[in-house]
Structures are given as structure tokens and as C-alpha cells.
Amino acid sequence: MEILIGLLIIAVGAFCQSSCYVPINKIKDWSWESYWIVQGVFAWLILPFIGAMLAVPSGHSFFELFDGYGFEVMMTMLFGMLWGVGGLTFGLSMRYLGVALGQSIALGTCAGLGTIMGPVLLNIFFPKMDALSSLTFSVILGVVVTLLGIAIIGVAGSMKASSLSEEEKKAAVKDFNFPKGLTIALLAGFMSGCFNVGLAFGSDIHFGTFTPDMYKTLPATFLVTVGGFITNAIYCFYQNSKNHTWGDYLKREVWNNNILFCALAGALWYSQFFGLSLGKGFLTESPTLMTLSFCILMALNVVFSNVWGIILKEWKGCSSKTIAVLILGIVVLIFSSFLPQWV
């Protein structure tokens, strides 16, 4: 029962993350770089800091978390900065492919590589940890089935691209470009997988038994998102200067509206990793699911992003065969979340 509860919590977080682009559509008169970094203040700084504080027991301070973990802190933030590059290209993948297909390919690549790269790199830096032992047959099988589901959805996307006229493509996704979007989505997925690598390096940054299991991932999550914020801030502020959009932040008439929806978008985005930490607290009896939890989160993100894609009519005009392939991919992804428990 605890495992089911853990998976349900992760699923709720995935649903929230897949919904985070809905409030962004309500933002008015701000350029992309302006609203992206403002929502990032909530998603990558404020809320992760509040989450990390939950890992600090009474009588201790936040900064005690990092005592004796200098190398781990540095590596966690470094991979957070690399993940930040993935976040930037992630947005471009949805620009050219739409929410459903863009998230599917990027998150699928992220799921597979993120799950595998963590133990591999930990084994290089800390061979005594024997991190590679966590990559069991069940874990690898779960990753393979997840990637199979992503591939099926990718086939649906290719079928969509070949069956629609240019006018229909533009009506569904304004800047639709499958080859360009696919390249960017694969890059975004590779770099985004660094998030889980950062979590792996920061897995010991907590107060041991004094920190409840469900909160132990939150300090590392904060460090990763701080690293990502740095990368995104550099790029967004550069774009503010290049495009002369610094004035966006001074538009008082839209300030309240935009801050509200940026905060909502940030909260929905962060909820996936808050939910991941809470959910893992219920998965401690299953080492396989603990290792595969990031992959499960990404798979469920893809499932819900495609549900939103259908709601937002991004698949409008596609044949019933294309929709059937899409649904098959979604079913395979859901199946992949439970498969490791049956192997």
C-alpha cells in the first residue's frame, strides 16, 4: 500500500508540472525572457528553499546541511547549471513541436539518461559506493520500456507531421518544425537528465535519521535548482539587454496579474520534485523504485503533457490511426511505472 501511495504522490506532482504552462498563457505584455526568469524565481529559488527547510530539524540551522559536503554541494550545483541549459532548450522544443510532442521527446530522453547517468558518474567519483549495483535488471527494463513508450509517441508525432498540411500544422503549433524541434528536444533531454545526476551527488546532504525520509531529497533539489537559476538568469538577462525588454519589469498595469501567474506556474513546476521527494519517502522498501523514481516521474510527465496536448487541440486534424498510436504510447508509459514491481 505504501508503494502505491508513493507512486500516486509522484503522479500528482507530474500532473501539476504538466499543467504549469497553462498559467503562463495568462501572462500579459511581457517578453519570454522576462516571464521565464520571474517564474523561475518562484520555481527555482523561493519554493525549493522553503522545501529544503523542511529537512532541517528543530535546533539546527539551514547552513549546517552543507557542513562537510563541499565537493557534493559543488557537483550538485554544477549539474544544476547543466540542467539549466536543458531547461532553456526545453522551452524551444515545445515552441517547434508543441506541449505534447516537445515534452514527450525531451522528457523521455531525460528519463532514460537521467536514471543511468547518476549511478555511472557516482561510480567514477565514489567507487566505494558501488552505485552501479543500483542499475539492476528491473531498473534497466523499466528505462527501456519507458523509452519504448516515448518512441511510440515520437512515431505518432512523425505521423502527425506527415499527414497535416502546413496550414493545419501552424494552426495547432504556430512554429511547428519537426526536424528542428526533434534535434532541440533530444539536446534538452540530455541536459535535463543532469537534474537527477545532481540529486545523486547530493543524496547525502541532510541530517540523517533526524530528517524524515520524505524530505531527504529536498536540500539537493534546492541546490540543483539554484544552479539552474544561475544559467537561466544569465541567458534571460542577456536577452533583456539584447531585446531592450528591461522595461517589462516596470509595467505596473500588468504587474499583479503577471506575478500571480508566474508564481502559480512556478508552484506547479516545483510540485513535481516536491512530490518526488515525498513519494520516495514511501518507496524506501523498494530499492528498484527508489532508483527508477526519476524515470517514473518523467514518464508520468509525458503522459499528462499529452493529455494537455489533446485538451489544447494540438492533435486536431490527425487521423484516428495517429491518435491510436499516441494512446498506445501513453499506455506503455503508464505500464512502465508499475512494471519493476512485477519483475
Give the positions of each predicted feature.
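Polytopic alpha-helical membrane proteins, predominantly small-molecule transporters/carriers
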Residues: M1-V343
